[in-house]
Each structure stands twice: as C-alpha cells, then as structure tokens.
Amino acid sequence: MISQFFILSSKGDPLIYKDFRGDSGGRDVAELFYRKLTGLPGGESPVVMYHDDRHFIHIRHSGLYLVATTSENVSPFSLLELLSRLATLLGDYCGSLNEGTISRNVALVYELLDEVLDYGYVQTTSTDMLRNFIQTEAAVSKPFSLFDLSSVGLFGAETQQNRVAPSSAASRPVLSSRSDQSQKNEVFLDVVERLSVLIASNGSLLKVDVQGEIRLKSFLPSSSEICIGLTEEFCVGKSELRGYGPGIRVDEVSFHSSVNLDEFESHRILHLQPPQGELTVMRYQLSDDLPSPLPFRLFPSVQWDQGSGRLQVYLKLRCDLPPKSQALNIHLHLPLPRGVVSLSQELSSPDQKAELGEGALHWDLPRVQGGSQLSGLFQMDVPGLQGPPSRGPSPSAPPLGLGPASLSFELPRHTCSGLQVRFLRLSFSACGNANPHKWVRHLSHSNAYVIRI
C-alpha cells in the first residue's frame, strides 16, 4: 500500500504527482524528497529513506526519479518491484520513458495510475490486461515508418540502410493508434552488457565484472511463440564445459518466469510466449575471467614541477577490440589537483575534444576503431601544486589530487562475454498473414571503468 506516487526530473521538477490516500503533506512531499536526496554527502542516494514518519522508496530511470511514499510498514522490496513494473508500463504505453514522453503523455500516465492502483493498493500491472481499459492514445514525437531510415545505424554505427532498423523503431508504444491500420508485427531483442573494471597504476587487472541482460520488446500478439537460440558453447559455472573450444562461460544466470527451459540444457534454446511490451528474458554475470582482452588500455605519463606549478599529462589510449569493431562516444574523466588555471592541449586527431570542468579534465572521442590508438598531451598551470604526503616530486609519484581516470563508452555489435544470439524464430500462425520483422542487437557499455594513475 502506498500513499503517494510522483515522478521528478533530474533537476527535481515534478512531472507527475498522485495522492492516493490523502494522509500525506501534499505536493510539498516531492520537494522534501528532492531536498533530502541532494543534501546527502558524496552524491549518495539510498533507495529507501525515512523522514517524518514517512518512508520514501525510489528508483532512477533515464534520469527520472520514480518515487513512492508510505506511512505503513510495507516491504521495501515489494515497492521497488512495483516501481520497476510501473517504469516498464510507462515505457510500453508511452513508447519510452524519459522527460519528454512523460510531458507529452500526462493524461495517459494519470489514467494508467488510476487503473494500476486503487486507494494505494495494486490492482494489476499487466500490459495486456490494462489495454482493455486505457482509452487515451500515446502522443509520440513523430510517427514511426520503416521507410524512415538514415545512414546511421543502431547505436550510431554506420551500415547499409536496408539492413538497419530506424532508431525510433523500438521506442514507440506497444499499442498502436486506433487510426493507424499499419501496425507492424515486430520484435526487438537486445543483448546488453555492463562492464566494470579496475586497473592498477602498473597496468595489472584488479577487478573485472560483466552484468548482462537479454531484453525483449514485443509488438506481436500475446499468443505468439518466440524461440531464441544462444551460442552453443554457452556454459554456466566453471565446472561445465561444452564442446572442444574454450567455451563462453558465465558464473550465474537467471530467467524470466515465462521462459521454457526444456531445450536449454541440450541445445541452448529458450522458448517463451511473451505479452506485448518489454521484459528481461535472461540475466547473467561473469567475474574475473573475460574470454577476450579488455576493450581499452590507458598508458599515462605524468611530469610535474612543484616550484613552477607546471603539470604535464600525456595519455595514450589503445583500443584492443578486433579491427572490424569500433567503440563510440568515448569519454575520459581525469580528476585534477585543485587550482588549475589554464590548459593547453595537443590531440592526435581533429575530431577529439578536451576541456576543463568541475575540477577534472574531460576528453571526448566520438569514435575509435579497433586496433588503433589515440593520444593527447595536456599541459596545465597549477599554483600551489603539491605532491603526496612525505614524498617530493618524482616521475613515479603523481601530484596530490590527480586521478584516477575513468572511461565511459559504447561497443555496438560486441559482447564482452562472447555471448551471441544464434537465431530468433517466431511462430507465424499467431501473426496472421503479416510477415513479422525481427531485430537482434548486441551492445556493451561501461559501468565503472577505472584506471589508477
């Protein structure tokens, strides 16, 4: 049972507010929550907070805060599950969940909340069941068309137009407009991995972790059966080996409750009849043993003089992806000593950009090809430059406040674990005469990629 539900933007602006029981402090509660959240030291944001006899439970999604409040003794895990399901529902009915789609579909969001919750009690969170009661149509930024193709492919990768789904294809509502008779039978399958890495100053690997998900967004009738074939060498745990190759191993795996695993052990095939909308078919984790080299290596060189306050940092970034692969939207963040007053730079290519901001160096590279390396030479004036405690200036001892460096990036058509989707098959009988469209995408991106200087 919840008392209130509201959605805040990343700046704390209220986008949606719903009071179910009238036992709270009105809209001021949303402002109180944001004040408490931003007032925490070090940017900490616990998902459960208690203040003034009221529990605040929240999740973050696409820069938005989805918050539920209650004055009762309710399991926080059940409320977190409810918020997660509400985020999925809003994405299903609005096309995607972000500040723009919420602002364009305020009436639809309130109608959904009225059907999902009655006096703060959950009635249903089923996309299929709710479609019988929701009358408001979603307002989308532009109508979807399979002919609206650009030269930029999935995740920004260049490819042939006739082989690429448009970028807006998977971000439209699962329920078509009543005036739109051209609704396509389509299914989107994404294999998404988040990579966490910690590298020591001498280049040795201290920690590596891969969190992966197979996400499905279906625009097919709910009775359609979907068959997903994974890499046959896929194995779970260190004791299980399949075939004669090195295998593709993960430590842990979990499946959605609707997945039929009858053929998983023998052929690595998943069967399911998903409802219309979005769900996570499978989650998996891999730690400490990647089958391929890390995507990036950073080779820093630091020279500094305490007397003159001159700091020179040379960074060489090497991409160890296969030559046919590439990384996109690479951003390097390097904290700097306090008091930097100027920056001069020499970059190895004209499409790079570097600037100072919030006490750090920001180095942006739009695209890096596998097997290549880029470099940047950065010289700064830092009055009052200081070395580590009890140590003077030394080539092996960086000045106080420098580093560690962190990288963020996207790797389209690449998985760090090596897991691939072999095939995606659909039952045509439930789709009628229309030929369903299938889109399979693989993507890895950084979660916390940290290199000590």
Curated annotation (Swiss-Prot):
Single GO term (MF): protein domain specific binding
InterPro entries in the cross-refs: Adaptor_comp_med_subunit, AP2_Mu_C_sf, AP_mu_sigma_su, Clathrin_mu, Clathrin_mu_CS, Longin-like_dom_sf, MHD
Keywords (A to Z) from UniProt: Endosome, Golgi apparatus, Membrane, Protein transport, Transport
Disulfide pairings: none
Tissues/organs with expression: High levels in the olfactory bulb, the cerebral cortex, the granule and Purkinje cell layers of the cerebellar cortex and the CA3 region of the hippocampus. Low levels found in molecular layer of cerebellum.
Annotated segments matching region Disordered: 383-403
GO biological process terms, semicolon-separated: autophagosome assembly; Golgi to endosome transport; Golgi to lysosome transport; intracellular protein transport; protein localization; protein localization to basolateral plasma membrane; protein targeting; protein targeting to lysosome
Membrane-protein topology: Peripheral membrane protein
Record's GO cellular component terms: AP-4 adaptor complex; clathrin adaptor complex; cytoplasmic vesicle; cytosol; early endosome; trans-Golgi network
One Pfam family named in its UniProt record: Adap_comp_sub
Transmembrane segments: none
Compartment(s): Golgi apparatus, trans-Golgi network membrane; Early endosome
Residues annotated as domain MHD: 184-452
Subunit note: Adaptor protein complex 4 (AP-4) is a heterotetramer composed of two large adaptins (epsilon-type subunit AP4E1 and beta-type subunit AP4B1), a medium adaptin (mu-type subunit AP4M1) and a small adaptin (sigma-type AP4S1). Interacts with tyrosine-based sorting signals on the cytoplasmic tail of cargo proteins such as APP, ATG9A, LAMP2 and NAGPA. Interacts with the C-terminal domain of GRID2. Interacts with GRIA1 and GRIA2; the interaction is indirect via CACNG3.
Assigned protein family: Belongs to the adaptor complexes medium subunit family.
Function: Component of the adaptor protein complex 4 (AP-4). Adaptor protein complexes are vesicle coat components involved both in vesicle formation and cargo selection. They control the vesicular transport of proteins in different trafficking pathways. AP-4 forms a non clathrin-associated coat on vesicles departing the trans-Golgi network (TGN) and may be involved in the targeting of proteins from the trans-Golgi network (TGN) to the endosomal-lysosomal system.
Name of the featured protein: AP-4 complex subunit mu-1
Organism: Rattus norvegicus
Species lineage: Eukaryota, Metazoa, Chordata, Craniata, Vertebrata
